[in-house]
Amino acid sequence: MNSDGVWLDGSGESPEVNNGEAASWVRNPDEDWFNNPPPPQHTNQNDFRFNGGFPLNPSENLLLLLQQSIDSSSSSSPLLHPFTLDAASQQQQQQQQQQEQSFLATKACIVSLLNVPTINNNTFDDFGFDSGFLGQQFHGNHQSPNSMNFTGLNHSVPDFLPAPENSSGSCGLSPLFSNRAKVLKPLQVMASSGSQPTLFQKRAAMRQSSSSKMCNSESSSEMRKSSYEREIDDTSTGIIDISGLNYESDDHNTNNNKGKKKGMPAKNLMAERRRRKKLNDRLYMLRSVVPKISKMDRASILGDAIDYLKELLQRINDLHTELESTPPSSSSLHPLTPTPQTLSYRVKEELCPSSSLPSPKGQQPRVEVRLREGKAVNIHMFCGRRPGLLLSTMRALDNLGLDVQQAVISCFNGFALDVFRAEQCQEDHDVLPEQIKAVLLDTAGYAGLV
């Protein structure tokens, strides 16, 4: 439907509105829907019709349609009949027609202010009416008090204007146009209650929600960045020496920092690894010391170590009881805490017991030398022990030119030397076995015994 229009009166056309937008309001008497022509005394009034072929007389029919969309508060105004008009009503209608002309002249401006879309199904949206004025439409069973004795209009007129529930009387168009400034409000993003939101409102709501999400994400990213930079500044102010940290201090720090935000998780991880390694090493050491270990887990190792310590304490208590029960005159027992002299004597006695083996002091020294293949010899020597005997014996063999390749030497309960193979290094002369035996006896302190 074309939204552009112009009023035509008896004298001629009115000037163009909005820079030459052509009007399409033309009189077409052949397409009148109603068979009731206007009275002869009102021929000078303006007539108009829509492009769809619906002629209306503003003095009778348009007033009837527009009165149903206005909530009138004046109950004292007389009810106008569509076909019986007096002089007062004619004068009032002429004033209304002038206001209608001024309203339709500013139609394009109102449309631009309201941002009404061009594609709609409501006929009067082209005039800039809100959805609140045109939300309700006529129905077949609804009849307003203003349409009395004119049933043909309700059945043939299309649904242009709503029928308010509280319309009880007739009023002029001046309240409608005077309240028009109050109706012109900025377009809200959210739809009003009871009506579906338009496509523009949905898109505006989506843009607003997306912008709010972007603002929230930017603010959260800035907060994370600032917290990260603050942590870096805190950690960069001091030098951390990880190698100098011990396990006790790490445990103390972890206990004190409970419930607080950890700045360096790597430091705590390294400290925990060192603590566990030290604990495992000590458990292995304890397991090697304790003789009886039932299982290899930590609980078993600790339990067996505790049992072993209890056993040692019991043995110590038994020894104390035995010492207290024996008389002090007994010379067979040593004191509980021996002196260094007695301790060294006991060590020597344990190393060289006098009664376990016969002493070589009562025996003659023995030296045996046997020749083997080539220039190799086999030497067996046994004598009493004295300080420096091993060193003097090895020097004597070296002076004789013998290279000892395999030998066994024992200083337990005497001096015993078994040389399994010794070769002569000097090629010009050979050393005889008797000569080797005499040199070894002389070294042992038994010169002349051959």
From Swiss-Prot:
Key words of the record: Developmental protein, DNA-binding, Nucleus, Transcription, Transcription regulation
Biased composition (Basic and acidic residues): 221-230
Matching InterPro entries: ACT_dom, bHLH-TF_ACT-like_plant, bHLH_dom, HLH_DNA-bd_sf, TF_AMS/ICE1/BHLH6-like
Region described as Disordered: 1-47, 207-231, 244-265
Major place of residence: nucleus
GO cellular component: nucleus
GO molecular function: DNA-binding transcription factor activity; protein dimerization activity; transcription cis-regulatory region binding
GO biological process: guard mother cell differentiation; regulation of DNA-templated transcription; response to freezing
Location(s) in or outside the cell: Nucleus
Compositional bias segments (type: Low complexity): 209-220
Superkingdom: Eukaryota
Subunit structure: Homodimer. Heterodimers with SPCH, MUTE, and FAMA.
Protein name according to UniProt: Transcription factor SCREAM2
